[in-house]
């Protein structure tokens, strides 16, 4: 069983779209804008890392 990486990427893209929609409807300060950018960057990389780890785990230990 290999974890589909596209599922993870799709979830991240949906999340980013959601954030962009809320950001355009509500005007935020510059500080808030940068903090969301940084958190999105971290979330994206964490998600990709988890997906990679899961795919490696299932590759080495098939059920």
Swiss-Prot record:
Location in the cell: Membrane
Transmembrane intervals: 38-58
Membrane topology per record: Single-pass membrane protein
Location, primary (coarse class): membrane
Keyword Membrane: yes
The keyword Transmembrane is annotated on this UniProt entry: yes
Swiss-Prot/TrEMBL keywords: Membrane, Transmembrane, Transmembrane helix
GO terms for cellular component: membrane
Miscellaneous comment in the UniProt entry for this protein: Partially overlaps RML2.
Name this polypeptide is given: Putative uncharacterized protein YEL050W-A
Species for this entry: Saccharomyces cerevisiae (strain ATCC 204508 / S288c)
């Amino acid at each position: 069983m290999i974890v589909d990486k596209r599922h993870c990427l799709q979830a991240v893209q949906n999340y980013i779209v959601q954030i962009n929609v809320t950001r355009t409807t509500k005007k935020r300060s510059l500080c808030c804008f940068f903090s969301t950018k940084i958190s999105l960057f971290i979330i994206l990389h964490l998600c990709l890392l988890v997906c990679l780890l899961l795919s490696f785990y299932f590759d080495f230990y098939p059920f």
